[in-house]
Regions:
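Bacterial Sec-dependent N-terminal signal peptides
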Residues: 1-23
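Carbohydrate-active catalytic/glycan-binding domains of CAZyme proteins
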Residues: 21-322
């Protein structure tokens, strides 16, 4: 009997140890990250949002169709799949749609999570629309609202930003990606209210990612070279509406073979770090694309740098990333 009990104890102990062994203490940059079940994380072109004790990572899932998938984590390294928020079955307008770069913010007035994204219908990029979906629960399926061209402008690569005063803004590439447009959203975040600026007309920039640090907003973008990486650049401004500085190079000539998708502030009890999140695209098999998490550094209030690290360890309690 004692031998039997011992065997049972050993079995559960080994099972516990195997689970513990899977807990990540660092992420290997440039690889396809995996979730807590060992499955590849499909959340490309994604954004992040903290709700309660969890960070949510919402992005493109291209393995079986074109979904918008949701993952959550308490430490930004160990991720749990929570489901698909949008699929081609969610709405008739999505039955042949390609969704890219979904971003989600929360509206305190309407109690809704609001998603904006790049919408295409079919195989090419001729539709060039923005699209919107909403949900009262970040882990539950979103309701598709509409797709449209903001004030008649094309809309491709995009990002969404909620400012400290609750106002929200949408950045997107327009005019065949030659211009970066900036719009202020309506109070419920489900439409554009005003076109604020055309940033760097003719600059041919895409993949916008925005963050505010201190008195300055920083906007990072990439050039337009299809799935091939290129020189990342950034600009800064004391006002989101501008004037914005000239574009400056950051990282190496290929952004370490990645393209920007988000800048995540990591607010801890000792410091605040800012994480660059990029996709390392595989243009032939999108779902095999890798990810890059790197800490941004600031030499002064308006100078931002990005250096390569093979791996990164994140401490959400202290706010340190190294």
């Amino acid at each position: 009997m004692m031998k039997y009990i011992c065997l049972i104890f050993c079995f559960f102990a080994l099972g516990y140890m195997s689970v513990e062994a899977q807990t990540k203490t660092a992420l290997i940059n440039g690889t396809s990250f995996t979730d807590n079940e060992g499955k590849v994380i499909n959340a490309h072109g994604g954004g992040f949002l903290k709700v309660g004790n969890y960070y949510y990572w919402i992005g493109e899932n291209r393995k079986q169709g074109v979904f918008v998938s949701c993952y959550r984590s308490k430490d930004l390294m160990n991720w749990e799949f929570r489901g698909d928020l949008l699929t081609r079955q969610s709405h008739p307008e999505l039955d042949s749609a390609n969704i890219e770069r979904p971003k989600v913010i929360y509206n305190l007035k309407t109690k809704q999570f609001v998603m904006w994204m790049h919408y295409e219908y079919g195989r090419d990029y001729s539709y060039a629309r923005a699209a919107i979906a909403t949900s009262s629960d970040i882990e539950k399926p979103f309701t598709f609202v509409k797709s449209f061209r903001p004030f008649g402008n094309m809309s491709r690569d995009c990002t969404l930003y909620k400012d400290q005063d609750g106002s929200a803004y949408f950045f997107s590439s327009a005019r065949e990606n030659y211009d970066m447009m900036l719009y202020k959203l309506t109070d419920d975040y489900t439409d554009v209210k005003k076109q604020i600026a055309t940033l760097w007309p003719g600059g041919h920039r895409e993949a916008p990612a925005l963050v505010k640090r201190g008195k300055y907003y920083f906007l990072m973008t990439s050039g337009c070279t299809g799935w091939a990486p290129n020189q990342a650049m950034y600009a800064f401004s004391k006002s989101i509406s501008g004037p914005w500085s000239e574009l400056k190079n950051i990282a190496n000539s290929t952004a370490f073979d990645s393209q920007s998708t988000f800048i995540l502030p990591l607010v801890g009890n000792k410091t605040t770090s800012y994480l660059y999140v990029g996709d390392r695209w595989d243009g032939k098999q999108y779902f095999k694309s890798g990810y890059i998490f790197l800490p941004l550094t600031f030499e002064n209030d308006s100078t931002m740098t990005l250096n390569w690290r093979d791996k990164i360890s994140i401490d959400v309690k202290t706010g340190k990333a190294k």
